[in-house]
């Protein structure tokens, strides 16, 4: 895990560098990220969340060992060195089991941590901020920290048992946006106060001491805070550096610590760069990448309709809509308004709840059909110009092949490029 430790060390020395974390399990997003990191010769941090991947399979159907195998196999197929790959676990704690009593939820969380660490995940975000069935709302800093320390102890023991030494790096912090974007419409967002950040750190330090874990404190590399960035279905709250000045200055007093910013999706390139300069040096991105995937697929579906007789079309968009209506559990509680508003949200929302549906076999078949239809003969350049204008420029200059897969990958990489530039440092 020298990559992360070295990044933090350089940042603390004033290099204004950072690293972005790709939070997606979609094969095309991961291929885009691996190929981009390979081309730029940078390490790549890929994270699975406790919703996506857990000991029972999560919503992707993958355990941590499955996810690691899947990512490593993809990396090998693309000749990306595994020692440049960093795997992280995000929101690890009782998140999935909030409807259970705390004792039961935390027992599951213990097993969750064991499964991630045993599978070789090295960056561990301990998040015990959520109240369980029999807990007060909200939890106190002390309870949150005690639970995180308990999980850290499990993680350390598991790491030593499986790898002979404990080399994990931890992220702590409880003041995170709702995973995957806000449910409600936003207008203003409270930035974490320096006092709240200090209180979280001190509560965790004390809890770790009580568990006999003082020695691992230097491996706690980041604190999750809210720098004032978020998105809902149609709006983005942009980073305002002046509102985060006190918070940014506060972390300068901690020798081995930086901030981690969640929900940085859809921030402008300028905001992403400023976040890193202001010590929010780990930038999480997920929905913006699957949003770009969806944009590219909708564009290719529109091109297909121009080129292919209706009866031979994949009907990707209609298949997607039908599946989302048949299985509304991933969007129903998020999207509100009349029928038309919900239809638009299903297709176009920044929160990109459609990402939960790509693994569906019907949708996957339609996607394969779309790619086959467009791979049979070259896509006319004017249609690429019409529907994927940024890719058109690269096709015309000879740096991009106009095949369906390459157009999709490149469109996703346009987002990754913004994060790469933000994290490069000086």
Curated annotation (Swiss-Prot):
Pfam families: GatZ_KbaZ-like. One of its GO terms (biological process) is D-tagatose 6-phosphate catabolic process. Pathway: Carbohydrate metabolism; D-tagatose 6-phosphate degradation; D-glyceraldehyde 3-phosphate and glycerone phosphate from D-tagatose 6-phosphate: step 2/2. One of its GO terms (cellular component) is plasma membrane. Belongs to the GatZ/KbaZ family. KbaZ subfamily. PANTHER family: D-TAGATOSE-1,6-BISPHOSPHATE ALDOLASE SUBUNIT KBAZ, N-ACETYLGALACTOSAMINE PERMEASE II COMPONENT-RELATED. Component of the tagatose-1,6-bisphosphate aldolase KbaYZ that is required for full activity and stability of the Y subunit. Could have a chaperone-like function for the proper and stable folding of KbaY. When expressed alone, KbaZ does not show any aldolase activity. Forms a complex with KbaY. This is D-tagatose-1,6-bisphosphate aldolase subunit KbaZ. It comes from Escherichia coli (strain SMS-3-5 / SECEC).
């Amino acid at each position: 895990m020298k990559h992360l430790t070295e990044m933090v060390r350089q940042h603390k020395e004033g290099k204004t560098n950072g690293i972005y974390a790709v939070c997606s399990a979609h094969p095309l997003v991961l291929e885009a990220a691996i190929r981009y990191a390979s081309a730029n010769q940078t390490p790549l941090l890929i994270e699975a969340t406790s919703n996506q991947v857990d000991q029972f399979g999560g919503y992707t159907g993958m355990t941590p060992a499955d996810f690691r195998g899947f990512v490593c196999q993809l990396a090998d197929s693309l000749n990306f060195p595994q020692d440049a790959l960093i795997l992280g676990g995000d929101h690890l704690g009782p998140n999935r089991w909030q409807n259970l009593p705390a004792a039961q939820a935390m027992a599951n969380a213990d097993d969750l941590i064991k499964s991630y660490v045993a599978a070789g995940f090295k960056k561990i975000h301990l998040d015990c901020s959520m109240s369980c069935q029999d807990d007060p709302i909200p939890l106190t800093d002390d309870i949150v920290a005690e639970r995180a320390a308990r999980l850290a102890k499990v993680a350390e023991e598991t790491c030593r048992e499986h790898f002979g030494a404990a080399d994990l790096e931890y992220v702590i912090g409880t003041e995170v946006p709702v995973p995957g974007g806000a449910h409600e419409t936003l207008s203003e967002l409270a930035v974490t106060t320096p006092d709240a950040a200090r209180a979280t750190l001190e509560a965790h330090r004390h809890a770790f001491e009580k568990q006999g874990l003082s020695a691992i404190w230097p491996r706690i590399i980041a604190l999750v805070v809210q720098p004032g960035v978020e998105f809902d279905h149609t709006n983005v709250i942009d980073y305002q550096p002046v509102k985060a000045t006190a918070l940014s200055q506060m972390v300068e007093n901690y020798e081995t610590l930086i901030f981690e910013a969640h929900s940085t999706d859809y921030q402008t390139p300028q905001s992403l760069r400023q976040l890193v300069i202001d010590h929010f040096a780990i930038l999480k991105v997920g929905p913006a990448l699957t949003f770009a995937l969806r944009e590219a697929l909708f564009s290719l579906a529109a091109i297909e309709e121009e080129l292919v007789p209706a009866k031979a079309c994949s009907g990707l968009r209609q298949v997607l809509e039908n599946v989302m209506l048949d299985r509304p559990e991933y969007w129903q509680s998020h999207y509100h308004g009349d029928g038309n508003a919900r239809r638009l949200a299903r297709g176009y929302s920044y929160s990109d709840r459609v990402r939960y549906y790509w693994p569906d076999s019907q949708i996957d078949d339609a996607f394969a059909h779309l790619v086959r239809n467009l791979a049979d003969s070259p896509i006319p350049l004017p249609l690429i110009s019409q529907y994927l204008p940024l890719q058109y420029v690269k096709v015309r200059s000879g740096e991009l092949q106009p095949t369906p897969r390459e157009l999709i990958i490149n469109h996703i990489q346009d987002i990754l490029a913004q994060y790469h530039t933000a994290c490069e440092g000086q």
